[in-house]
């Protein structure tokens, strides 16, 4: 086995790493932020850690590809009334529409296959 080239590995700790503010295509920033090591993908695609501040509601969106996430901290209220808590592993099939609200903030490990499409 050959040694790992330092440029082939990135490591960040979610407790002290710098998150990047997520800015929507229309320029709006709602306070959510992303920690993503793969800079070959657009911010928010592929695997990343997603942080929502207390009181934030995401915009309604449709998934263009599957979404999967694990709630690491906090609580997430889905638009259909489902309440997700730390430890919940969630899968949304391609084409699913929803939005989410967090009363006290939350941290998620997320994989999103493709860009989301805004819906009302």
Predicted regions and their residues:
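A short, N-terminal "cap"/entry segment at the start of jelly-roll beta-barrel domains
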Residues: 1-44
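Conserved short histidine dyad/triad with adjacent acidic residue
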Residues: 33-63, 83, 93-97
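Structural motif
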Residues: 45-49, 69, 105-107
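Well-ordered beta-strand positions
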Residues: 51, 70, 91, 101-102
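Glycine- and acidic-residue-biased ligand/ion/polar-headgroup-sensing regions
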Residues: 54, 63-79
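Hydrophobic alpha-helical segments of small multi-pass membrane proteins
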Residues: 66, 90-92, 110
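Ligand-binding loop in jelly-roll beta-barrel domains
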Residues: 94-119
């Amino acid at each position: 086995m050959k040694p790992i080239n330092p440029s082939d590995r990135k490591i960040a700790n979610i407790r002290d790493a710098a998150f990047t503010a997520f800015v929507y295509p229309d320029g709006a920033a709602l306070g959510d932020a992303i920690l993503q090591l793969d800079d070959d993908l657009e911010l928010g695609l592929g695997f990343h850690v997603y942080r929502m501040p207390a009181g934030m509601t995401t915009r309604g969106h449709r998934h263009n590809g599957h979404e999967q996430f694990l709630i690491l901290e906090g609580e997430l209220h889905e638009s259909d009334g489902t309440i997700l808590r730390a430890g919940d592993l969630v899968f949304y099939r391609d084409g699913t529409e929803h939005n989410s609200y967090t009363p006290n903030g939350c941290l998620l490990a997320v994989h999103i296959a493709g860009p989301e499409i805004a819906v009302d």
